[in-house]
């Protein structure tokens, strides 16, 4: 295989530079050494790669095919070399990032672009989690790092975590929903009369639960907050939504915010990671997320106690 790789490199340089002399300078070898290497492969395989009948060697059809396919091989080999070096330095081959469904994924797009500009050898895989499902993905080994997780972190030294801030939630209904006309603050007895729209917990351990669902309250359980938002706008139910997700619909009048007795508006939000398996890619994402001003803005409180968005 090594002689073939050498020939592929020679053919690539020859086509780019135009002559054996120029190619030899690029490869730091003599023209005769390059010519001998190519000729030996031709002899071993009983093929002709170059037509040497003219002043300059020209590629035969076989030579052009080997050049074209060979460049793909060279690219793969070079990427493999870079990947091996990066892995040796501590960069993961793959990084699985669990993203809680309440987290605004669009804020990760600039970080993905920045990461791949310099660290393309690490493949990124994103998975979704809801409520306890985000922590579950981390503790069960399905994710290397999670972002936007709510509720309390696990009490194990295997995992590290840092608080991103607080997620503000608002109780919202459509203007034509019966609760829109009820006097504020709404009490639980009144809310319980109407169907809730909830997002199901994706935790695998134990029974899954739905957040802020009252006892014996009728509910539709959906798989993400985008669907929950759509159903509440349609008037099919009521419930809490992240303020950043609901705000433009509150501003347009598609939703109405209602105050609720003894409501908890802010939920602590975390980033967590596996201390045992964390490499350089995990560290890069942890640092960038914690330093990102746009992400901080989603989870920051303003002076009036509301989300800073």
Swiss-Prot record:
- According to the UniProt entry, the coiled-coil residues are none
**Its family?**
Belongs to the LysR transcriptional regulatory family.
Instruction: Name the Gene Ontology molecular function terms of this record.
Output: DNA-binding transcription factor activity; transcription cis-regulatory region binding
Asked whether the keyword tRNA-binding is assigned, the reply is no
Query: Could you tell me what this protein is called?
Result: Uncharacterized HTH-type transcriptional regulator YeeY
Q: Which Pfam families match?
A: HTH_1 (PF00126), LysR_substrate (PF03466)
Q: What SUPFAM superfamilies does its record include?
A: Periplasmic binding protein-like II, Winged helix' DNA-binding domain
**Record feature DNA-binding region, as residue ranges:** 20-39
Q: Which organism is it from?
A: Escherichia coli (strain K12)
Gene Ontology terms describing biological process? regulation of DNA-templated transcription
Family matches, as PANTHER family: HTH-TYPE TRANSCRIPTIONAL REGULATOR, LYSR FAMILY TRANSCRIPTIONAL REGULATOR
Has keyword Transcription?
yes
What the entry lists under Gene3D superfamilies is as follows: 3.40.190.290, Winged helix-like DNA-binding domain superfamily/Winged helix DNA-binding domain
Keyword annotations for this protein?
DNA-binding, Transcription, Transcription regulation
The HTH lysR-type domain covers 1-60
């Amino acid at each position: 295989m090594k002689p073939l790789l050498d020939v592929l490199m020679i053919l690539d340089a020859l086509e780019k530079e135009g002559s054996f002399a120029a190619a030899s300078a690029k490869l730091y070898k003599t023209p005769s050494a390059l010519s001998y290497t190519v000729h030996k492969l031709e002899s071993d395989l009983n093929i002709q790669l170059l037509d040497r009948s003219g002043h300059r060697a020209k590629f035969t059809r076989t030579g052009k095919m080997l050049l074209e396919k060979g460049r793909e091989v060279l690219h793969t080999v070079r990427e493999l070399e870079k990947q091996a070096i990066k892995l040796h330095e501590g960069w993961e081959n793959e990084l699985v990032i669990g993203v809680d469904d309440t987290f605004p994924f669009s804020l990760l797009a600039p970080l993905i672009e920045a990461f791949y500009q310099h660290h393309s050898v690490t493949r990124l895989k994103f998975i979704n989690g809801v409520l306890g499902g985000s922590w579950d993905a981390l503790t069960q080994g399905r994710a290397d790092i999670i972002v936007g997780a709510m509720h309390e972190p696990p009490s194990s030294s295997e995992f590290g975590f840092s608080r991103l801030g607080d997620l503000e939630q608002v109780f919202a209904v459509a203007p034509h929903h019966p609760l829109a006309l009820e006097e504020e603050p709404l009490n639980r007895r009144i809310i319980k009369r109407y169907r809730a729209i909830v997002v199901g917990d994706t935790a695998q351990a134990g029974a899954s639960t739905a957040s802020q669902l009252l006892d014996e309250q009728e509910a539709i359980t959906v798989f993400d907050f985008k669907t929950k938002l759509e159903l509440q706008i349609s008037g099919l139910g009521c419930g809490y939504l992240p303020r950043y997700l609901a705000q433009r619909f509150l501003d347009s009048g598609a939703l109405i915010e209602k105050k609720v007795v003894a409501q908890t508006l802010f939920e602590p939000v975390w980033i967590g990671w596996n201390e045992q398996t964390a490499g350089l890619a995990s560290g890069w994402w942890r640092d960038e997320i914690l330093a990102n001003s746009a992400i901080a803005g989603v989870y920051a409180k303003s002076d009036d106690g509301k989300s800073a968005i």
